[in-house]
Amino acid sequence: MLYDIVIIGAGITGSMLARELSRYELKVAVLDKENDIANGATMANSAIVHTGYDPVDGTLKAELNVKGARKYPKICEDLHCHIKNTGAFVVACSEEEEKLLDVLAERAVCREIPHEFLSGDDAHAVEPNLSDNITKVLSFPTTSVIYPWEVAIACM
């Protein structure tokens, strides 16, 4: 059989690509070296839907992290997959590290990513298991986690 498109890899990226291409009248095949969907990097990743505050300005990663994070709640709703809004803390234990938090906050402002600074005490009130050495926290309340294998399987 001849195919219009062959996708190499049945992880979350290949599966999502196959789902998008299924909207068109194309013959699409998905190939993977593993014996099942999402058995490679997808199975072993952190499952965090990154909001996009970390990548350097002007990079494709910065652009796509922000766009993807904003799309994921709808994607998971459409696919009937779980998504959990956990939020994320980036912590500082010194003045030098606090300066790095300021850089991340500037990126978040430019990218319109919700964030807020917390004192070490305020952060401990939310998460008591944090180190006592924490002086400042940058909170990203819209950070979420998914089950990547669930999303990959739902796409197929």
PLM feature segments, named:
Residues 138-156:
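Helical element adjacent to the flavin cofactor pocket in flavoenzyme catalytic cores
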Residues 47-126:
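Dinucleotide-binding Rossmann-like beta1-alpha1 core, especially the glycine-rich loop
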Residues 22-44:
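Glycine-rich FAD pyrophosphate-binding loop
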